[in-house]
Protein backbone atom coordinates (compact mmCIF):
# COMPACT_ATOMS: atom_id res chain seq x y z
CA UNK A 1 0.00 0.00 0.00
CA UNK A 2 1.42 3.38 -0.93
CA UNK A 3 0.49 6.95 -0.15
CA UNK A 4 -2.31 8.34 -2.30
CA UNK A 5 -1.43 10.51 -5.27
CA UNK A 6 -3.39 12.77 -7.56
CA UNK A 7 -3.58 12.30 -11.34
CA UNK A 8 -0.08 13.77 -11.74
CA UNK A 9 1.44 11.41 -9.19
CA UNK A 10 1.83 14.16 -6.57
CA UNK A 11 0.93 13.71 -2.93
CA UNK A 12 -2.48 15.03 -1.82
CA UNK A 13 -2.90 18.75 -1.43
CA UNK A 14 -5.57 18.68 1.27
CA UNK A 15 -5.00 17.17 4.71
CA UNK A 16 -8.32 15.36 4.46
CA UNK A 17 -6.99 13.40 1.45
CA UNK A 18 -4.64 11.55 3.81
CA UNK A 19 -7.55 9.90 5.61
CA UNK A 20 -9.23 6.68 4.59
CA UNK A 21 -12.82 7.84 4.19
CA UNK A 22 -15.97 6.17 2.99
CA UNK A 23 -18.18 9.18 2.16
CA UNK A 24 -21.28 7.01 1.90
CA UNK A 25 -20.82 5.98 5.53
CA UNK A 26 -19.01 8.96 7.02
CA UNK A 27 -20.01 12.30 5.60
CA UNK A 28 -18.70 14.40 8.44
CA UNK A 29 -15.80 16.79 7.78
CA UNK A 30 -14.94 16.63 11.49
CA UNK A 31 -13.83 13.05 10.92
CA UNK A 32 -11.27 14.11 8.31
CA UNK A 33 -10.17 17.13 10.31
CA UNK A 34 -9.49 14.99 13.37
CA UNK A 35 -7.48 12.35 11.57
CA UNK A 36 -5.56 14.61 9.18
CA UNK A 37 -3.43 15.86 12.05
CA UNK A 38 -2.04 12.39 12.65
CA UNK A 39 -1.50 11.48 8.99
CA UNK A 40 1.81 13.28 8.57
CA UNK A 41 5.27 12.27 9.71
CA UNK A 42 6.04 15.66 11.25
CA UNK A 43 3.11 15.30 13.66
CA UNK A 44 4.26 11.81 14.60
CA UNK A 45 7.82 13.12 15.04
CA UNK A 46 6.57 15.84 17.41
CA UNK A 47 4.78 13.26 19.54
CA UNK A 48 7.74 10.85 19.54
CA UNK A 49 10.08 13.66 20.65
CA UNK A 50 7.89 14.53 23.66
CA UNK A 51 9.99 12.89 26.38
CA UNK A 52 7.38 12.99 29.16
CA UNK A 53 4.70 11.56 26.89
CA UNK A 54 6.91 8.80 25.53
CA UNK A 55 8.28 7.89 28.96
CA UNK A 56 4.74 7.52 30.31
CA UNK A 57 3.68 5.24 27.45
CA UNK A 58 6.98 3.35 27.49
CA UNK A 59 6.74 2.65 31.21
CA UNK A 60 3.08 1.63 30.96
CA UNK A 61 3.93 -1.01 28.36
CA UNK A 62 7.53 -2.07 28.95
CA UNK A 63 7.32 -2.22 32.76
CA UNK A 64 4.27 -4.49 32.58
CA UNK A 65 5.32 -7.33 30.25
CA UNK A 66 3.05 -9.84 32.01
CA UNK A 67 0.05 -7.90 30.69
CA UNK A 68 1.20 -8.54 27.10
CA UNK A 69 3.09 -11.86 27.13
CA UNK A 70 1.23 -14.43 25.03
CA UNK A 71 -1.76 -12.10 24.55
CA UNK A 72 -3.57 -10.77 21.50
CA UNK A 73 -3.40 -6.97 21.51
CA UNK A 74 -5.35 -4.28 19.66
CA UNK A 75 -3.59 -0.92 19.23
CA UNK A 76 -6.24 1.66 18.30
CA UNK A 77 -4.86 4.57 16.26
CA UNK A 78 -1.36 3.14 16.05
CA UNK A 79 0.18 6.17 14.30
CA UNK A 80 3.89 5.39 14.09
CA UNK A 81 3.26 1.93 15.54
CA UNK A 82 5.38 2.49 18.64
CA UNK A 83 2.91 0.98 21.13
CA UNK A 84 2.36 -2.02 18.86
CA UNK A 85 6.13 -2.50 18.59
CA UNK A 86 6.58 -2.30 22.37
CA UNK A 87 3.71 -4.74 22.96
CA UNK A 88 5.33 -7.20 20.54
CA UNK A 89 8.71 -6.75 22.21
CA UNK A 90 7.03 -7.58 25.53
CA UNK A 91 5.95 -10.92 24.13
CA UNK A 92 2.48 -10.35 22.67
CA UNK A 93 1.46 -13.32 20.54
CA UNK A 94 -0.26 -11.05 17.99
CA UNK A 95 -0.79 -7.29 17.73
CA UNK A 96 -3.43 -5.77 15.46
CA UNK A 97 -2.47 -2.13 14.92
CA UNK A 98 -5.32 -0.09 13.44
CA UNK A 99 -4.60 3.27 11.78
CA UNK A 100 -7.13 5.31 9.78
CA UNK A 101 -4.58 7.43 7.92
CA UNK A 102 -1.87 6.62 5.42
CA UNK A 103 0.54 6.73 8.35
CA UNK A 104 -0.22 3.00 8.32
CA UNK A 105 2.27 2.61 5.46
CA UNK A 106 5.04 4.14 7.58
CA UNK A 107 4.05 2.10 10.64
CA UNK A 108 4.29 -1.08 8.59
CA UNK A 109 7.82 -0.17 7.48
CA UNK A 110 8.85 0.51 11.09
CA UNK A 111 7.38 -2.80 12.24
CA UNK A 112 9.23 -4.67 9.51
CA UNK A 113 12.49 -2.78 10.21
CA UNK A 114 12.23 -3.99 13.81
CA UNK A 115 11.77 -7.59 12.68
CA UNK A 116 8.24 -7.81 14.07
CA UNK A 117 6.24 -8.31 10.88
CA UNK A 118 5.23 -11.80 11.97
CA UNK A 119 3.67 -10.48 15.20
CA UNK A 120 2.36 -6.98 14.35
CA UNK A 121 -0.26 -6.63 11.64
CA UNK A 122 -1.00 -3.07 10.50
CA UNK A 123 -4.63 -2.61 9.44
CA UNK A 124 -5.48 0.59 7.58
CA UNK A 125 -9.01 1.28 8.72
CA UNK A 126 -11.02 3.08 11.32
CA UNK A 127 -11.63 1.16 14.52
CA UNK A 128 -15.36 1.37 13.81
CA UNK A 129 -14.98 -0.48 10.51
CA UNK A 130 -12.07 -2.85 11.10
CA UNK A 131 -12.82 -6.57 11.13
CA UNK A 132 -10.44 -8.48 13.35
CA UNK A 133 -9.95 -12.19 12.73
CA UNK A 134 -10.04 -12.98 16.45
CA UNK A 135 -10.96 -11.59 19.84
CA UNK A 136 -8.31 -9.51 21.62
CA UNK A 137 -7.16 -9.69 25.23
CA UNK A 138 -5.69 -6.20 25.58
CA UNK A 139 -6.55 -2.84 24.01
CA UNK A 140 -3.96 -0.06 23.99
CA UNK A 141 -4.16 3.42 22.48
CA UNK A 142 -2.42 6.76 22.50
CA UNK A 143 -5.79 8.40 22.88
CA UNK A 144 -4.49 11.63 24.39
CA UNK A 145 -2.37 12.71 21.42
CA UNK A 146 -0.70 16.00 22.28
CA UNK A 147 -2.66 16.47 25.49
CA UNK A 148 -0.71 14.25 27.90
Predicted regions and their residues:
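Intrinsically disordered, low-complexity glycine/charged-rich regulatory or linker segments
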Residues: 1-45, 65
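Conserved alpha-helix/loop element of class I SAM-dependent methyltransferases that forms part
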Residues: 52-71
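Conserved class I S-adenosyl-L-methionine
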Residues: 71-77
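Conserved SAM-binding loop of SAM-dependent methyltransferases across substrates and taxa
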Residues: 80-93
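Conserved SAM-binding motif I beta-strand of class I
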Residues: 94-99
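Conserved short alpha-helix immediately C-terminal to the canonical SAM/SAH-binding motif I
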Residues: 102-106
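S-adenosyl-L-methionine
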Residues: 107-133
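A short SAM/SAH-binding and catalytic strip from SAM-dependent methyltransferases
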Residues: 137-148
